[in-house]
Regions:
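N-terminal mature ectodomain segment of secretory-pathway/periplasmic proteins
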Residues: 1-92, 153
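Generic beta-strand hydrophobic packing signal
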Residues: 19, 141, 154, 191, ...
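Short beta-strand segments enriched in hydrophobic/aromatic residues
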Residues: 25, 50, 158, 193-195
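Short acidic, gly/pro-rich beta-turn/loop elements at beta-sheet edges
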Residues: 31, 56, 164-166, 189, ...
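A short, polar/proline- and glycine-enriched secondary-structure boundary/capping micro-motif
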Residues: 54-60, 165, 199-205
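Extended beta-strand-rich segments in extracellular/periplasmic secretory proteins, especially
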Residues: 88-185, 189
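Non-transmembrane domains of secretory- and envelope-associated proteins
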Residues: 93, 134-137, 146, 170-176, ...
């Protein structure tokens, strides 16, 4: 079960392309919930619970010629969903290839890490001879219900090789941390520090929709007044002749 948990932590980039969710930093209250729409790669919209816009990605259709002309090796990496990882028998990612990883986060490193929690597992399994070199050690994971979805829950303890994507906002705190990973998306839907000065700190994420159709109009600064094809369009043909 531990290997399943770690492989699930590596799998997020290949399990979904768009996500609609609510996010809460803990400790916090319902007033601090953020509603989010995310479409890979790089498109993010954030609102307050009452619909006030907090952030919307701009420039998602801009030319990237300056980026490629920079001619760095990283600038030519493909998005993760365009490269093929090594899968285990359950269809989870055992070994991640080199790719252009990264999630939009609007300055919140924990949110970006939660969307792709590979920092809890590393890009590949560690050698059997050195099990202590895992980024975190795990208690036996178990299946739980999280907001109506199946998740794997465990308590993790940081190892010497743990390297959070944002050192200031890690998923795993010093001491023990309760972690939940959504089984369908590979997203870390909950974290909570259990020890020390950080006790109670973490996050809670509620998934509302996966792989929904999202127009560009949702993410740009000004509406392009595009038609949402999901909505019924009525045709008024006037009175009969």
């Amino acid at each position: 079960m531990s290997s399943t948990f770690r492989n699930l932590c590596r799998s997020s980039p290949w399990k979904w392309t768009s996500l609609r969710f609510e996010y809460l930093e803990r400790p916090g209250t319902g007033a601090n919930i953020v509603r989010a729409w995310l479409r890979r790669p790089g498109a993010l919209r954030l609102e307050t619970p009452d619909g006030q816009l907090l952030h919307s990605t701009t420039g998602i259709n801009d030319s990237r010629d300056d980026f490629y002309v920079s001619a760095t090796r990283r600038s030519w990496l493909l998005p993760a969903h365009l490269v093929t990882p090594v899968y285990d028998d359950a269809g989870l990612v055992r070994r991640r290839p080199e790719a252009a990883y990264g999630e939009p986060s609007f300055g919140n490193g924990r949110l970006a890490a939660a969307l792709d929690p590979v920092e809890l597992a590393g890009n590949a399994p560690v050698p059997m001879e050195f099990p202590d070199s895992n980024p975190v050690s795990l208690e036996e994971p178990r299946e739980v219900d999280h907001e109506g979805r199946v998740a794997l829950e465990t308590v993790v303890t940081r190892g010497r090789s743990y390297a959070p994507s944002d050192p200031g906002e890690p998923l795993a705190h010093q001491g023990r941390t309760l972690i939940r990973i959504d089984a369908g998306t590979g997203v870390c839907v909950a974290s909570q520090s259990l020890d020390g000065d950080t006790s109670g700190k973490g996050h809670w994420l509620k998934i509302l929709g996966v792989d929904e159709y999202m127009l560009d109009d949702l993410f740009v600064a000004e509406s392009m007044n595009l038609t949402d094809v999901r909505r019924h369009i009525s045709w008024d043909i006037g009175p009969a002749a």
